[in-house]
Structure formats: structure tokens, C-alpha cells
Curated annotation (Swiss-Prot):
The keyword Nucleotide-binding applies. GO terms for biological process: glycogen biosynthetic process. This is Glucose-1-phosphate adenylyltransferase. Homotetramer. Alpha-D-glucose 1-phosphate binds at Y98, G163, E178, K179, S189. The lineage of its organism: Bacteria, Thermotogati, Thermotogota, Thermotogae, Thermotogales. Its EC number is 2.7.7.27. InterPro entries: ADP-Glc_PPase, ADP_Glu_pyroP_CS, GlgC_bac, GlmU/GlgC-like_hexapep, NTP_transferase_dom, Nucleotide-diphossugar_trans, Trimer_LpxA-like_sf. Pfam families: Hexapep_GlmU, NTP_transferase. Belongs to the bacterial/plant glucose-1-phosphate adenylyltransferase family.
Length: 423
């Protein structure tokens, strides 16, 4: 099938995830009790036998770069091939940063040359899915295509969030529009492409020299290939599980789907394992008298209270008499005694005092940003401390690094927020 090199676009800011991505890139966001979002794409690569991988970073890359390291958890610490972090070649000007997804790959054509790329697999590092990329590549070769885009049908009311394509009866793409206001189809791009290298190189160089281009695959490169008939593009229909967890609501829902009796996304398939870089921790402990049901509880967690329909990450401690419902609690967060938390997302290393009630009260629109904070979820940023006896409503936001003295009273009404700005 030719020498395939994967390029993972991992520079996304993920602004719709609010405080969860204020200090880290979206692909580094924790997910599913022990993983980070990029783990799924990296694992798909190695499970598909693809061991030449470039990770293109940009926004807040430190946590992501540290997480990937030399790639050992994914068997990517190799002399021949392996994983390489590819930041932008930043000079003295901000314009030296990646200007778009196409420009990011263009800036790394030398990496592709060094790895003797014949096929280039372009992937997003912030989606949750399991895909054997060989199926995509086999289809691409069968069609003798210049490029192939993985796609799936989505509800027509959601189609304007995606790149939307129209195909002929043979699966060849005849039209493509990025996030159309009035979509003419519901066949959505998954942001997963395979290109013949020489073809990709040619169109990227041409795009780079186009002063009117924003240098993005979906907005510029794909439409131009079709408009000017530069090559053949085909649609590969994927019928497996795929989630774009780009909003707080979709992130929360995708986590809680994992606890269903028959989860739509299978973390337990021995033939398609997901790998990650985590700290070694002892087994989880559930104390006498505690109740845990329909939940994921990761290693190192200590549960002295009650947990229902929730995802509990590594090293989390839940105090006696505390109830956690429909929530996502991230690594090393500690919750005191006699608390009640419902419909909350708590980031890493948060300390919650005793007798705290969170996610309660009347419904209310967010006073901070209704476009980001909606769906009545209360969100707490990393490294915050919430004092004893607080009552925090629905759809509230506690920012990163908030301290007890930052709260003006013991009550935070639904829709309200406490944010401490960086110095």
C-alpha cells in the first residue's frame, strides 16, 4: 500500500470547551477516566500498523508534548520511524505560526520527504473514535484516487457544523462546502484524509502561493481541487463510532456514553486497544457502605461516598456521605464529606471542601458566555479550591486556580461565575 506517514493536527485551541482548554491544547484534554483525546488517534495509527507519525502542535503544547514524549506507550519509540513532535518554525513574527491546517502540513513537507512518504494520512488529534486506517487506504487505492476523505451521515440539523460533501454514484466527490449555512447534503467530513504524496505536495505548494487562501484543507484546498478539477477525490463512508467532543455538552455526553450497559464506544476490545501515558497507581478502592453504579472508576481512586452514572479519573478521592451523579471528575481531584454534585465537569487537581452542593437550583443562562457554557453543566477549572459549605448552581463556571477568598459569598447562583485572570 506504499509507505504511509500520518500527520496528526494537534494545535487546536478548543475554545468551545471553555476553562478545560484555557491552559492546554484540545488534544490534551482528559477523557474516559485515564486517557487524553489524542490517545485515540495515536492508538488507531499503531493498531493500523502505521509507525511513522508526526504530531503538529501549536497552541499551549507543553502538556501534550510531555504526554507523548518519545511515544513509548504507543510503541512509537523506534529508531526507524516513530513519533515526532512538529511545532511551527517560529521566527520573530507571529505569521511564522501555522496559518491553517494546510499550511501546517506544508511547513512539514521536509518531514514527509525524510520519511519517504508515498501516502499521507492527515488526522485530527481531538476526536474520539476507533478506525482501522487500512480500510480507508485500501478504498483509496481501489478507487485510484488522488485523495480520499472519511465521512459519515449526520443529522441534517447538525450538518452546518461540518464540511459537507456531495458525491456521485461511484463515491467521487463533486462538491464540498465547509460549514455551510444551508447544507445541501448531510454527508459530513470527519477531518480524516489520505492523499498521494506527490499530489498533496503539488496542491499545498500552490495553496501556499495563493494570497487569497486561508491555507485550510476544508475551506481552501479541498474546494479548489474540485473547482479547478486538479485531481480525483473520493468519499470513504465510515459507519463506526466517531465523536467530535468540541463542546462541553458533547464532551460530557461522550464520557457518560462510556458507562452505558452496552457502550457505543468499546474501550475493552482486546484486538483494538487504546494506549496512554499514565502514572502507575494502585487499584481503585471502594469503602464499606459506599455505592457505585453505572460508572467508570479508574485506578488510584478512593470512593467513600456514592457514585452514580459518572466517570471518575485516576487518583480521585470522594469523601463519606458525598453523592456524585452524572458527572466527570478528573485526575487527583478531592471531594470532601457530605457533598452533592450533579451534572458537573471537574478538571484536574481540584480540591472541594465538605458540605458543598454543586449543580443544584433553578435553570439559568450563563452570564459568562452562553455560547460556550450551556446545557446546565457546571464546570470547574484545574487547580481550583472550593471552600466548605458552598452552594453552586447550575450552568456555573469556576475558573482555573480559583481560591476560597475569590468567592464573595457561600452561594453562587445558577449561571454565575468566578474567574481569576492570569497576571
Amino acid at each position: 500500500m506504499g509507505n504511509t506517514v500520518a500527520m496528526i493536527l494537534a494545535g487546536g485551541q478548543g475554545t468551545r470547551l471553555g476553562v478545560l482548554t484555557e491552559r492546554i491544547a484540545k488534544p490534551a484534554v482528559p477523557f474516559g477516566g485515564k486517557y487524553r483525546l489524542i490517545d485515540f488517534t495515536l492508538s488507531n495509527c499503531v493498531n493500523s500498523g502505521i509507525y511513522r507519525v508526526g504530531v503538529l502542535t501549536q497552541y499551549r503544547p507543553h502538556v501534550l508534548s510531555k504526554h507523548i514524549g518519545i511515544g513509548r506507550p504507543w510503541d512509537l519509540d523506534r529508531k526507524d520511524g516513530g513519533v515526532e513532535i512538529l511545532p511551527p518554525y517560529v521566527g520573530r513574527h507571529e505569521s511564522d505560526w501555522y496559518k491553517g491546517t494546510a499550511n501546517a502540513v506544508y511547513q512539514n513537507l521536509e518531514f514527509l520527504e525524510e520519511n519517504d512518504a508515498e501516502l499521507v494520512l492527515i488526522l485530527s488529534g481531538d476526536h474520539v473514535y476507533a478506525m482501522n486506517y487500512n480500510d480507508l487506504i485500501d478504498y483509496h487505492l481501489l478507487k485510484e484516487a488522488d485523495g480520499t476523505i472519511a465521512c459519515m451521515e449526520v443529522p441534517i440539523e447538525e450538518a452546518s457544523r461540518f464540511g459537507i460533501m456531495i458525491t456521485d454514484v461511484d463515491g467521487r466527490i463533486v462538491d464540498f462546502e465547509e460549514k455551510p449555512a444551508k447544507p445541501r447534503s448531510n454527508l459530513a467530513s470527519l477531518g480524516i484524509y489520505v492523499f498521494n504524496y506527490e499530489f498533496l505536495k503539488k496542491v499545498l505548494i500552490e495553496d501556499e502561493n495563493d494570497p487569497n487562501s486561508s491555507h485550510d484543507f476544508g475551506k481552501d484546498v479541498i474546494p479548489r481541487i474540485l473547482r479547478e478539477n486538479l485531481g480525483s477525490l473520493y468519499a470513504f463512508r465510515f459507519d463506526g463510532y466517531w465523536r467530535d467532543v468540541g463542546t462541553l455538552r458533547s464532551y460530557w455526553e461522550a464520557n457518560l456514553e462510556l458507562v452505558l450497559p452496552v457502550p457505543p464506544f468499546n474501550l475493552y476490545d482486546p484486538n483494538w486497544r487504546f494506549f496512554t501515558h499514565t502514572e502507575e497507581m494502585p487499584p481503585a478502592y471502594v469503602a464499606p457502605g459506599s455505592k457505585v453504579s453505572t460508572s467508570l472508576v479508574s485506578e488510584g481512586a478512593e470512593v467513600y461516598g456514592n457514585v452514580f452514572n459518572s466517570v471518575i479519573f485516576q487518583g480521585v478521592k470522594i469523601g463519606r456521605g458525598t453523592v456524585v451523579k452524572n458527572s466527570v471528575i478528573m485526575t487527583r481531584t478531592e471531594i470532601g464529606e457530605n457533598c452533592y454534585l450533579e451534572n458537573v465537569i471537574i478538571a484536574e487537581n481540584v480540591k472541594i471542601g465538605s458540605n458543598v452542593r454543586m449543580g443544584v437550583g433553578e435553570d439559568a443562562e450563563s452570564k459568562l458566555d452562553p455560547k460556550v457554557y450551556s446545557g446546565l453543566l457546571t464546570v470547574v477549572g484545574m487547580n481550583s479550591v472550593i471552600p466548605d459549605d458552598m452552594v453552586i448552581g447550575k450552568n456555573c463556571v469556576i475558573g482555573i486556580g480559583v481560591r476560597p477568598e475569590d468567592f464573595k459569598s457561600k452561594t453562587l447562583e445558577s449561571g454565575d461565575y468566578v474567574i481569576v485572570r492570569e497576571e
